Every structure is written in C-alpha cells, then in structure tokens.
Amino acid sequence: MVKRIGMRRLAAFAAAAALVLGLVGCGGAQSTAQGNTEPVNLSVWTYYNGDQLESFNKLVDTFNNTVGKEKNITVESYSQGSVNDLETQVMAAAQGKVGASAMPNIFMAYADTAYAMDQMGELADLAPYFTDEERAAYVDSYLTEGDFDDSGSIKIFPVAKSTELLFLNDTDWKLFAAATGARYSDLETVEGLVKTAEAYYNWTDAQTDTPNDGKALFGRDAIANYMLIGAKELGETIFDVKDGKMTMGLSEDVARKLWDNYYVPYIKGWAAASGHFRSDDIKIGSILAYIGSNSSATYFPTQVMLSDTESHDIELKVLPTPHFEGCEKVSVQQGAGMAVAKTTDAEVEASVVFLKWFTQPENNIAFAVGSGYLPVTHAANDMDAIHSSGLALTGNMENVLMEAVDAVNTNELYTTKAFEGGTDARSKLNYSMSDIATADRATVEERLAAGESAEEAEAGFLTDEYFEAWYQSLCDALSQYEG
C-alpha cells in the first residue's frame, strides 16, 4: 500500500547555513527552477518504513512549506513497501504494463536497478545541473556510484548512505569478559573475532554438563558484503566491472581465507544465523554480536527473551566492523540513491531543486539522526556538525553515528559497479556460503545428537577437497554473469 508523506518544520542548522547547494543558479551548471510560473508536482517513490519513513516524511513537508512553496514545487511521496516491491513497481511503470502506476519523477534505486533503467533510456543525467564546486561537496564515491560509463554522469543521486558496524550485547559480553579476560580490541580483526568466538563457545559450553552445547558469538547480516569487502582488503575484486561488463576475480587462496573465517566457525557453532535478521538472533540470545548496517541500529533489541518466562535487559555497544589483519581497511558503501526519470525539463529541474535541498547539511543531518543513515556531504559527515545541528541524539545513535562517520572518513569505501545481472550475481554470492554453512551445521548437530564427537561430526566438512568443490561451484555459478 502506498503511504502519503506527513509534515513538520525543522529548525535551521546555523553552523552550516552558508553552505546552500544549488538553490540559486551557478555558473557552469544548468540553472534549476528559479520560481516557476506554472506549478510543478513531483512524485517520489521510496521503500522507507518505520523511523526512516517518519524522518523522510517530515523533511518532504518542510520542503513543501518553504522552498517548494517559493518555487511553486510540490513533492508527494509514497512508500511502496519493501525494496523488492519498489523495484517491481518501478519496472512495471517503465514498461507500461497494464494496471501499473505512472512513472514517478524520483524513485529510490540501487545501482543495478538504476543501470537497467538507464539501459532502457528512462533516467535523466543530473550532472549538467551541478557545478564542480557543488559536486566537490559530496563524498566522491557516492557520486561515482551513479556514473555507469565513467563519463562524469550522475544517474543515481545520493541522499543517505550506510556502512557496516559491529553491534554487541554488552551486558552479556561483560560477563564473558570478566570470566575470560576478553577485550573489545579482540574484535577489531576478523581473525580476532573468530578466535574470540571459539573462546565464547567453549566458555558457554562449560556452563552446563551437556557436551557441545556452547553458544555462537556472532552472525552477519550480509554474507555478500563480507565476501566482497573481505576480498577487497585481501587484494582482489570479485566483480571487476568495466563498461558494464563483469570479470570475476576471486582466487582460490582468497576464497579459502573467506571460507576459514565464516564457514568453518559456523559449522563449529561459533557463528550462527537463524532469524530473518541477526538482530532477531540477538533478541533470543542465540548470538552476542552481529555485523550489519549502521541503519539497523534502531532495530537492536533492548531485551533478550530466552523463553516465555525468562528475559533480561541488555545494553548496546557499537564497535567498528572487524577487518582482516594486516590489510588496509575497506568499508562497504551501501544504501539506495534517488534516480530521476527522464520527463520534462521543468520536472527534472524541480527534482534537482528538491534533491539539492534535501542534501543540505542541516536537512541531511536531520534525516540521518532520525533514521540511522549517514549524510552524503563532507560538511555533514562530521560529528561536530551533527552536534551543532541542535538535534537530540540518543546515546545509542550518538555512538552509531560516531563509529559510522569515522569509518567513512578514514577507510576506503567500496561498492560494486553496476552490470547486467548484478543483482542475481550478488544473490548467488550471498547464499553460496551461507546456505552450505547452514545445511552442514544442521548435519553436524544431528551427528552430535547421535553421540559423535565434535571432531567426528565436523571432519568431512573441513577437508581441502570439500572446500575446493564449493569454490569450483561458486566460480561456475558466477561465470555466467561475466561479459
């Protein structure tokens, strides 16, 4: 069901008031709507829900009551539900399917969807509407994500981004740390995380007389991110894209490193994934920590529910995502941007006015604080600027933004370039390791229940031959997407 946007005026952000991006015409860029004599109505489709939708709602109506009113532009925003629902609706509109809605002026899109729409000739290039100075205000990699042909085009405009962090049930961690001497710094590397996970499994196993009933320490929301970013830190690019054509770049050595630090700990019970999201697993106490998007922070539970009658309150500790030891740190760049449909000049110009306004520091910070996402300009990606905004930060949101902003400002950011079939290829990568790990752990648990030792139950899954068979099957699956 589509949902109409709500309304609220926001306080001005005094510290960044001087940075007004594109609300007046600048030399070198196509001028944007300077007070249209004819009203322009814009439709925006998103997949936002919950806090993120509420935060977006407030800003849209602020625009309508201020700059939009001045320039005769009205924005109407609709949530299409989920990411998949939005992609389906946009594609149906673009293809003119019977019963489909009219194409929106602006819609949220990930790179692969936007690339497909661009190949259909549906997207406007926003580059002519930005001066070099205006472009320089944005985090560069956020803009280049929408430059499909490396010509400097802007086919996806960034409005909010995210990266990954480690979210920890600090309450129960402290019990483990007090008993074993474990430290937060042990979780700074992937190798340290796995070693600590082994210690946590053994420590929890020793709490009962039942053998092999230890608990997993961690989980991951996106295995594809782990593999893509891990490979990048280890010197390889799994999806190497040039001119829209992908060449797979994953050596057996790097694949083995990735395997040893997720599949192996998973089948040993040191890592786990059972709920739809790892925050669900935190809630039932099956894991103590997870690596996931900073935008997932609002879903971190405040209680662990061990049963219908047993629960306890927990506190969140936010830490940087673990990186591979001895490697340059790479952080994932994720989050959909806004694509503008190729319609009339007046509508495209009005769309740019709205997007520039939305990404002014005071407005972008307001959205980030309300939703857990990150601002997209250099000026707004700064904790001093966020504090100066005057907007209230909860303790958790303060820590989330601090760690995420630090990752963006200090680490290399990486996201895959768009290519035909990219969404399906990423899905195959995502499930290639997680599905086999889940199935094999279930087999191990059956064998343990039948009386086998852990060594006996796991042995067949830890051989070189077993890894090599998986690696070859992955290469075969991904090779069909090569250009």
Q: What residue ranges belong to the model's regions?
A:
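Extracytoplasmic/periplasmic substrate-recognition and gating elements
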Residues: 95, 267-268, 307-378
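Conserved C-terminal helix/tail region of periplasmic/extracytoplasmic solute-binding proteins
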Residues: 405-483
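Hinge/lid segment of periplasmic solute-binding proteins
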Residues: 108-165, 209-210, 230-231, 313-322
